[in-house]
Amino acid sequence: MTALSIIIFKILLIIFGADFLTGVFHFWMDVYGRADMPFLGKHVVEVNMIHHKNPRKMTSNSYFSLTWTSWATALLMLVLSVWFWGFHWEIVATLIYGSNANLIHKWTHQTDKENGRLVSFFQATGIIQSKRHHGWHHKAPF
């Protein structure tokens, strides 16, 4: 394999890996998350509960309000990973993609017109999660 093909392969693994890990975390929040948990309760679990009651509410949120907890967690993880293992671009790429999971989630609740052609194309081709695929998640019990 050439260096470029190795990088492309790593990027694909990073995207699928980060997508899987954020999905596992979201599943964990739905099943085990409690509003009285330290930090996560107020800033993650409560927000998730509100989202399940009114899924479109998140579409009016700014990028920062959607992703700040993910970016704060990613920054902490980056500092720790650099401290213990040194700098690796793969870790940075994973944290960047993972930190934007809520933006991709927001797109599943928007119309094609709100998303624009590029995002709608990515959803239609399965490159990112489609509205239909995400819809089952909002059926009880969640």
What is each model feature region?
Residues 1-142:
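Hydrophobic transmembrane helical bundles of multi-pass organellar membrane proteins
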